[in-house]
Amino acid sequence: MRGYARVVSHPEPRLALLDGGKRDFPYDEGLPVPFGVATALGGEETPLAGASVTALNDQHAFLRSDAPLPVSIGDVVSLGLSHPCTAFDKRRWLPVVEHAGSTRVVDLVRTFF
């Protein structure tokens, strides 16, 4: 399961703030894991090797790395989510994508969590 968040601030070379936090992503079984970054949702992703989400607050994620992050404000970061149950309780509808890695939505599933 993946979530997506935009880069809203890049105040330091090794720190970026994303527009998703505890209200958006599950965190009880681990923080989101960054997979890649693209200039737009569905765009070609550049891997974020060595990057990690180190903290979440209500509405933001803190993306950090030992090396400068290859991100710009407005970029979209894909995140692996640790626990589906606490993702389902945040949404009434979940998109179903065509295949793993795709952003083409082919169906919606209603949740009753």
Model-derived regions, located:
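Active-site anion/phosphate-binding pocket segments in diverse small-molecule metabolic enzymes
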Residues: 1-113
